[in-house]
Structure formats: structure tokens, C-alpha cells
Amino acid sequence: MSTAKGNNAENRRPIYNPISNVESLENYVPGGYHPVMVGDVLHDRYRVVDKLGFGGYSTVWLAQDTQLKCYVAVKVGTVNSPVRETTVLRELSTAMSVPAPASQGRRSIPSPLDEFELRGPNGIHPCYTMALAECDLRTVSYSQLFPIEVARALSGGVVLAVAYLHARGYAHGGMP
């Protein structure tokens, strides 16, 4: 970090050299991201171990559940998150008649394990925990392509999950 030079102290503000593949520091403002650090304990239960990722409306952290003695993903939303994801995920996990083959996609929709709020300097942040995913497909496929059988199975699973979402009246807005 360096400082912008100006005629007086009021014109001096920090200039940050951006790092790729991380959220913007400018989003750590009221209404934005909640500051989380490795070692923090969230909700008197989840000890933060590492950062898993981020999106436009959240950061995701690997944490140890100190009660159940297992690892979970903790998603910490921004104050201004447009929707409560947990409401949608819980609704999607409830039994409802959906035509086949879309009904097969229900297995791919995770259910939240716990839901809570964090109060911080930027506001009140919605949070929830999930079971950890097996791996990050983008990272795994970066070094080499999947065998065709694996690629077909993964693609088929995504298609079934999206078909299930659509059959339930939802559309996923964050797909590349």
C-alpha cells in the first residue's frame, strides 16, 4: 500500500495495488463484506481455518465446527445481499413433485447446516454453513482435462441440477 500525494493531508488517501482473484478492498464498507480473519471464531462455534473463495455478495471460509469436530464451509454474505440464499436452499430441499428426469437433480442441491448472523463494523451479515464440496472443479481441471467419461458425468449432473432448479421455478444467476 502506498499513499496518494496531495497538497494537504485531506487529499492523502491510500492507494492499493490490486491482487488478482480476491475481492476488492473497496467493498469492505458499510453494507459490504464482513472482515473475517483466519483464527476468528464465528457464532461461538466455527473456527476459521482458510479462505475458500468470494463472490459479489459473499466470502466463503473453511472452518472447523468446534461442536461437531468436523470441517464446514461458512458463507458470510454482504449486508446488501439481494436474497436470503438459505430460504431458497431450504425450499429446494423440501419434497415436492417434480417431473423426471429433473427430480434427479435434487441430490445436487445442498442444504444449509446452520444459519446465523454476524454483527460487525459494516452491518449485520447473513451467514450459513454447508458441508464441504469434494473439490473445486475449476482448480482440478486447470492442470489437465478430465477424461471424457468424467466430463460427461459432471456435465450431466450440472444439467440435472439446473433442470431441477427450473422445475421448481428458480434460475441460477451466477453461472459462467
Locate the predicted segments by residue.
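Short beta-strand micro-motifs within the conserved protein kinase catalytic domain, predominantly
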Residues: 99-126
